[in-house]
């Protein structure tokens, strides 16, 4: 699933092509995504200007003349900017045609993506209303994290992936950030001191920023808006490296299950 870095890479890529452009046509080839795509978009969106493209958590927010188009990439979604003459393929479900003979095409083989319209204050949308702070913002700091987790018995990795505590951190980047912080993914969140929380926050910010700079991670489906894969997977320290030597101490990387997710860690470096 695309996590915050992949969504931010997508946002930055499409912003240069879409911001300030007018929508001329909408094509929907498959309405059956995670929630049905509204057929009203076919008549509602043409003529509207795309003013800005921002990101909240893993949601892309297209602020248009009369409301906001909300897109979530789901498990396997990607957005491409292409000439309108580009033939569609099997998993190309949705297109925004623009006034420059380009289009934004949404591709999603597994169809867990989301395309929604909201004509009110987008901050009040039910999907966005109760989200935690952005991990790269000043609001996410050691004191904040310590306050949020100090009475929780869940593991620190589960806490990092809780979107009500902090948004956008999925399994890959939780594993990597915990390694860089020297904290085991298995320990109880409530056992962390303020100092450890501050160290973890720094590791989260560093990991996400490096991933964005590397174009995100491309393990299966993800590509940026011009079809290029990310390369952050080449920089993983623990994720997916079960049984391989830790790049820091040489001990073998361990793997365990936490809920429905795999956790990767170095038992020597992470306590």
Curated annotation (Swiss-Prot):
Signal peptide extent:
none
> Which SMART domains does the UniProt entry name for this protein?
Fapy_DNA_glyco (SM00898), H2TH (SM01232)
Q: How does it assemble?
A: Monomer.
Chain intervals annotated as zinc finger (FPG-type): 237-271
Name the domain of life this protein comes from. Answer: Bacteria
One Pfam family, short name: Fapy_DNA_glyco
* Record key words, sorted: DNA damage, DNA repair, DNA-binding, Glycosidase, Hydrolase, Lyase, Metal-binding, Multifunctional enzyme, Zinc, Zinc-finger
- Binding of DNA occurs at 91, 110, 152
State the organism named in the record. Answer: Nitrosomonas eutropha (strain DSM 101675 / C91 / Nm57)
Q: Which GO terms describe its biological process?
A: base-excision repair
Task: State the family named in the UniProt similarity comment for this chain.
Answer: Belongs to the FPG family.
Might you give the EC number(s) for this enzyme?
3.2.2.23, 4.2.99.18
Free-text comment on the cofactor: Binds 1 zinc ion per subunit.
Q: Where would you find the membrane-spanning parts of this chain?
A: none
Keyword Phosphoprotein recorded: no
Any GO MF annotation of the entry: 8-oxo-7,8-dihydroguanine DNA N-glycosylase activity
Question: What is the name of this protein?
Answer: Formamidopyrimidine-DNA glycosylase
State the protein's purpose: Involved in base excision repair of DNA damaged by oxidation or by mutagenic agents. Acts as a DNA glycosylase that recognizes and removes damaged bases. Has a preference for oxidized purines, such as 7,8-dihydro-8-oxoguanine (8-oxoG). Has AP (apurinic/apyrimidinic) lyase activity and introduces nicks in the DNA strand. Cleaves the DNA backbone by beta-delta elimination to generate a single-strand break at the site of the removed base with both 3'- and 5'-phosphates.
């Amino acid at each position: 699933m695309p996590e915050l870095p992949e969504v931010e890479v997508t946002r930055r890529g499409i912003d240069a092509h879409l911001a300030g452009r007018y929508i001329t046509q909408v094509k929907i080839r498959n309405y059956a995504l995670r929630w049905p795509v509204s057929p009203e978009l076919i008549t509602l969106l043409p003529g509207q200007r795309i003013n800005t493209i921002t990101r909240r958590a893993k949601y892309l927010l297209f602020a248009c003349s009369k409301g906001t188009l909300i897109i979530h990439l789901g498990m396997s979604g990607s957005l491409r900017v292409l000439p309108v003459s580009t033939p569609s393929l099997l998993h190309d479900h949705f297109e925004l045609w623009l006034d420059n003979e380009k289009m934004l095409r949404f591709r999603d083989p597994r169809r867990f993506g989301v395309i929604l319209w909201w004509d009110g204050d987008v901050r009040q949308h039910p999907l966005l209303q109760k989200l935690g702070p952005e991990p790269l913002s000043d609001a996410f700091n050691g004191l904040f994290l310590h306050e949020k987790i100090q009475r929780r018995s869940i593991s620190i990795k589960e806490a990092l992936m809780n979107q009500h505590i902090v948004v956008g951190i999925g399994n890959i980047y939780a594993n990597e950030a915990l390694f860089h912080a020297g904290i085991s993914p298995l320990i109880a969140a409530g056992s962390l001191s303020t100092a450890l929380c501050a160290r973890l926050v720094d590791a989260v910010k560093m990991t996400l920023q490096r991933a964005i700079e590397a174009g995100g991670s491309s393990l299966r489906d993800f590509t940026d808006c011009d079809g290029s894969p990310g390369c952050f997977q080449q920089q993983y320290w623990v994720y997916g490296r079960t049984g391989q030597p830790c790049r820091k101490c040489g001990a073998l990387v361990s793997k365990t299950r936490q809920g429905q997710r795999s956790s990767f860690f170095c038992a020597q470096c992470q306590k």
